Amino acid sequence: VTSALPAPLIELASGHGVATEFWDWQGNHRQVEESTIRTVLGALGIPAQDDDQVAASLRARREDPWRRVLPTVTVIRSGRSHRLPVHLPVGTDFRARVRLEDSGVLDLEHSRGAVNREVDGAKISELEVLLPGSLPLGWHAVELVVGAGERKGNGDAPTHSMPLVVAPEKLELPEFLRGDGDQGWGVMTQLYAMRSRQSWGTGDLADLADLGAWAAGLGADFVLVNPLHAAEPHPPMEPSPYLPTTRRFANPIYIRVEDVPEVAYLSAAERQLVEWHADDAQRFLDLDFLERDAVWAGKQSALLMVFRQGRSVRRERAFHAFIEREGQGLVDYATWATIFAIHGPDWREWPEELRDPRSEAVEKLRQDRSEQVEFQCWLQWVLADQLAGVQRDLRETGMRLGVMHDLAVGVHPHGADTWSLGDALARDVTVGAPADQYNQLGQNWSQPPWRPDKLAELGYAPYRDMIRAALRDAGGLRIDHVIGLFRLWWIPEGTLPREGTYVRYDHEAMVGILMLEAHRAGAVVVGEDLGTVEPWVRDYLSEAGILGTSILWFEKDYDGDGGLLPPESYRELCLATVTTHDLPPTAGYLQGVHIDLRHSLGLLNRPLEEEKAADEADREQVLADLRRRGLLREGAGVAEQVEALHRFLSFSRAKLLGVSVSDLAQDTRVINQPGTDEEYPNWRVPLAGPEGRPVMLEELFTWRSARRLARTVSREA
């Protein structure tokens, strides 16, 4: 296809991973708008607003690698040798070595220069250093000692250094999943919505432990929980767990106050006040929608009292060890939360001297407000302690994985990460998705993307720290929109989602680092790979040992009659479920509640009756498939239909199966309606029973129907 774009602009964009064309979900070839390409290049720090800038940027693109002695970072797989380019003035003597993360040193072989080029008036030679495939896994450094001649000795100070990451060739499955036909199962929950009579109006980590213990008693291997990332530290709190302020730290609303050891130090009057806050929160349990702000106001007051009690010598040492381990990232987050309380939620509107986390003004404020900063650090320590306790308890109850955390695709555009990580996150663009069959106008998620160039310059440290935090005390990790490790749809600010373009990432580095950290954590990784995906990507992830995601409603036999994909045809390396949080609970889906809801919100693309007829025909085809397989009797009610769908899924080849707590409760209400904001109470709907009445965990655990559905997934029913 002939492009109308200037050839130099196409070359520049291609060199920086910016797509100038793509294929849409209907198989149509699309050319990206020229203005979009220039804006996205600008967001990557590449001047491209006119032909002169494009020409200059192209020259820089061609010459910059020759100006750099070593690449910014290199990520390789264990067992594969790699030739590392080195650029030095012609005739320069040097010695290359790898300094291993355990402080060991290995000398490296290198070739003499075979290619020379003149750059900035100097003749530069390109040489190659051989990285052997025998290097151990880990975070190492390649060091060059220039002018060393043939001298040996590891004491020479390196002249140049580069981070080197060695990742496993493949992320191996846990032993219990390695055999042919081996399968595990677990429950999936939105923790905030799943309450008990002991929680303070929203679900907490003690509730998570109780759910896990109950499920473990039925043979479950994991509990998949929504992203627990931190939201705003003061009202109003963003309800979506997929729009956090940071992905490295967690939301203290999930703390169970009574389980903090220092509660024992409270005076009788203080303990009575904590009990009053707990009792007051009970009034939120019977409401139709969750009241996060009110819940957090009471919980924060109680936690502040506990914080001010001080700690034992042992606990104080543990607290400071946590602060030291988390480093500058924790201090930055705590400082941001403190300034937030003073100057409001958008750091871009703070006094100018406070917009830079490394400014003297920020350091002074940190000292002046040291108690508030320490309180925020303490909240994260308590969270980490309780999360570790949940994972420990679940493994002790017999779960083979335990908690599976969920990693959101991005962060709030003016939250903690955008303040503290600087230009590692792109400005003036947001992440979204092009049009597809479910969202024909495209999507804008209002989240700033990682800048691939800055991640590389930082040695992927911010990405690594985020992954490590998500994997700490976890048996598994779900990656929302795992395709974002390969490419993301960047949308210039002020434009429509369809006016964006794809920007590529170094997927070898992104996936390799994920594999290394998951290997070290002993965790399974599940990638949510729904939507528009390049055909080779799923194969790449599978070869890396990363599981995909299969949703029953989306798995159709397109080579047959268009009905359900037979369970024996499911891919093996996946987490298979009947539903997902962007669909209604299965009982609601079977009753068409999503059609009625979308109609009431004006989201249908065709008349209501036409939409209902098509939806009913699709569901009837599914139910007919179940009846033909002998899994469903004629005239069966909704509860039996839900059970039959899960029984069908249990015959699949998928390594992991999941059942939603909403399905265990026979809930029908939609958790999240894509395409809406204030029009629907997204992420504020509590767990309810079939009549729409909120249901507590204590009640759910007594339901025979819940146990029967869980056993259906485990093939025991």
Where are the regions that the model predicts?
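Alpha-amylase-like alpha-glycosidases and glucanotransferases acting on alpha-linked glucans and related
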Residues: 91, 234-384, 410-658, 662-664, ...
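Short helix/loop capping segments that flank catalytic or ligand/cofactor-binding pockets
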Residues: 23, 174-175, 197, 412-413, ...
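Long, contiguous interaction/targeting segments characteristic
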Residues: 1-65
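Short, exposed coil/turn segments at beta-strand boundaries within extracellular/luminal domains
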Residues: 149, 154-159
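Structured C-terminal cap/extension of enzyme domains
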Residues: 666-717
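Acidic/aromatic-lined carbohydrate-recognition and catalytic surfaces
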Residues: 43-103, 107-144, 153, 163-420
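Residue-level detector of anion-binding/catalytic polar loops
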Residues: 19, 221, 400-402, 476, ...
